[in-house]
A protein has these predicted regions:
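Sequence context of c-type cytochrome heme-c attachment sites
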Residues: 7, 15-196, 203-204, 210-233
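Noncatalytic linker/hinge segments flanking ATPase motor cores
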Residues: 117-124, 202-205, 244, 320-328, ...
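N-terminal export/targeting leaders of redox proteins
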Residues: 1-75, 130, 248-418
Length: 418
């Protein structure tokens, strides 16, 4: 128990020429080590499929089959949504559709191409997306012609699109069908594989390789290994079972107040010390997240115990703690790591003067900043903008605004003082 301290013609080397720009807050790093072309694949069927499916870099799709209609050939998520209506709606409102937003784009204007290429491995991994980004930013190796009809011109800004996970060489892949499928399906049907229901599929982008960046001896992103070491992981409860329940393409996590609240079990106990003093103790247990709460170095969660009068007005903070792994803005030093492992309990408590009268209570509040590290980093960058273009500053300000507006607050418990 923890006591809290208070396109086809584009070659695979498209984004390899350096531009010499400065790289600021580089958090992205491709996940588990991926094979390069010509390297032997693992013998385990899941590992073998994933190694081929996520070969680095992904090759262009190539020309679509002649019999494909424009909708069947298109890489646009909107085209997929013509038939996969619910999946498209879920994706459209998810964070996966925003992985190539202002928070990434302002940095691309300062990065060299190899660094940006590393980010796009997970944020916008298709070769066609890289080509469009190169066109937009004027990078070396950008295609000289317009994209083919099956590549929408905004594909690079749509983030982790359907095709990033489900399409290779215009062939569709997905989990095994739950019910029998029709004899004739659009886009020549699909190839089922169990890898889509295995946590290793998610590890491709949610687990840094052993050679990845470490702070205080710990990988910067270690979500898959945190899960593997947890009771849910050992029991075979996959990432998809929580974050894609019933195959919904929602991927809810720390940004979602309901999902975050469900990850915790809390109790609040009051003890009378004497006629004038009382003690409150809150126990907060990570019972629902199969990884650290929170995972990664970006989010921060602040818990507070508050004295509240009969009218519901706060009358004093009794105790506060931050649950997070905090690093400095340039990611060279871990400042602290107070996160809860799966199944771990933290205790927050303090003494207070017993109020007179009835109707007083103690409330346990949770304030979540899903992008806390980004907020600090982006604010720091805004203080050093002399080398930035006007458009870069605009994107940076929008990225900061988005990070700040993602915050939320939840009352987890209310205990009446008797």
């Amino acid at each position: 128990m923890k006591k809290f301290a208070v396109w086809t013609a584009v070659g695979v080397g498209l984004l390899m020429a350096a531009s010499g720009a400065h790289n600021f807050f580089h958090l992205s790093e491709h996940g588990q080590d991926r094979p390069v072309s010509g390297q032997a694949l693992p013998t385990d069927p899941i590992d073998g499929f994933l190694a081929a499916h996520w070969i680095d870099p992904l090759p262009p799709q190539g020309a679509p089959p002649a019999q494909f209609s424009p909708i069947e050939a298109s890489l646009a998520p909107e085209a997929c949504g013509q038939c996969h209506v619910q999946q498209y709606r879920d994706w459209r409102d998810s964070l996966h559709s925003r992985t190539a937003g202002p928070g990434l784009l302002w940095q691309f204007r300062l990065m060299d191409q190899p660094a940006a290429n590393g980010c796009m491995r997970c944020h916008a991994p298709l070769a066609e997306q890289k080509a469009l980004m190169a066109l937009e930013l004027g990078w070396t190796g950008a295609p000289s012609s317009s994209p083919p009809s099956y590549v929408p011109t905004n594909l690079h800004r749509q983030g982790l699109v359907c095709a990033a996970c489900h399409v290779r060489a215009h062939r569709r892949f997905g989990p095994p069908a739950r019910t029998p499928t029709a004899d004739r399906l659009p886009h020549a049907g699909f190839s089922p594989h169990a890898a889509f229901e295995d946590s290793r599929f998610c590890a491709v982008c949610h687990q840094f390789p052993e050679s990845g960046t470490r702070l205080n001896g710990k990988l910067l992103e270690n979500t898959y290994e945190e899960w593997r070491a947890s009771r849910p992981g050992r029991a075979g409860q996959t990432c998809q079972s929580c974050h894609m329940s019933d195959r919904r393409h929602l991927w809810r996590g720390i940004h979602d107040s309901e999902m975050t609240t469900r990850a915790l079990t809390v109790t609040v106990d009051l003890t009378v010390l004497d006629r004038e003093r009382m003690r409150v103790e809150a126990k907060i247990t990570n019972t629902g997240a199969g990884h650290y709460f929170p995972t990664y170095v970006v989010p921060e969660v602040v818990f507070t115990l508050q004295l509240v009068d009969p009218a519901g007005r706060p009358k004093g903070e009794i105790a506060r703690t931050i649950i997070a792994r905090r690093a400095n803005v340039d990611l060279t030093q871990e400042l602290f790591d107070h996160r809860l492992r799966s199944g771990e309990t933290g205790i927050l408590g303090g003494q207070f003067k017993r109020p007179a009268g009835t109707g007083w209570s103690i409330e346990l509040h949770m304030a979540v900043s899903p992008g806390a590290h980004y907020e600090r980093s982006f604010q720091y960058a805004l203080e050093h903008t002399a080398h930035m273009t006007r458009d870069t500053r605009r994107l940076l300000r929008e990225a900061l605004r988005q990070a700040e507006t993602a915050r939320y607050r939840v009352t987890l418990a209310r205990t009446v003082i008797h």
